[in-house]
Amino acid sequence: MYSGEPLSPFVENYLNYLYETQPTAAAFDGVHQYDDLLEDPSRTVLEGQGRELGGLVRQLAAVGKSGMTKTEQVEREMLTANIRARIFELENIRSWERNPQRHSEILATSLAGQVLFPYAPVGERARRILSKLKQTPRLIETARKTIQDPPGIFIREGITSLNGVVEFIEHDLPRALTSLDDMHLLSDLADASTEAVTAIHGYTEYLRNEVAPKARGSFRLGRENFDGKLELEEGVTLGADRLLAIAQRELRETQEEFRSVAGRLGGDVASALERLKQDHPSAATLVSTAQ
């Protein structure tokens, strides 16, 4: 890429890169050429992605602003922040080595994407589900090797999330594939499901019995990382102290408004909220009321 090249080719290249490395996100964007795959969250791969994203930042910097519209210039800055935020997550926040829930979310979302959206015949989607289930033991083994000293709350939430994935595989997937009449494929799915569930159960037991008792990690990001996420992901450069002051001011103003409205209703905030609860439609009429 050279200075002055239009922005569009870079955007296309960047999207292709994201789709190749994040097949689940690709599926939710309607790109299904990677649907047979699960993400590879191994240390080697993710550290390599950090370097590759750094190269993309440099490529984008070489796209000259001259000839760009104002909108394109803004988009260029947004793209830069987006890529830098991904690098920041990989290299600074490093949730991929701290949070076992991340791996369960990859698997759950990837499987759900094939169930929820009938973009292809059920047989085709079932074969892609089969492929993902066969890759599940590898994903779980990667989690076992990669996660280091996770905070206790991350362990508890990870176990809960992984148990939810097991429930999905054992109960929701069969219901979603009731129209599938390929007995050979159904048999393969049953076998792959059993192997996937066995791997997940083994990992949750490992987390519960070996990792949790020794967990000393902190869930806190720290001020520097918190400010970095705000700037790169939200475009907010005010800093934590300033944001806290704004939040406290807004809280006080909101509380005062609550008290004022409650007073006009002839009571305190608690009694006003109780009156609102009594005016709530029943479960049977909730949808029709909203309509």
Enumerate the predicted regions with their spans.
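N-terminal maturation segment of proteins
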Residues: 1-291
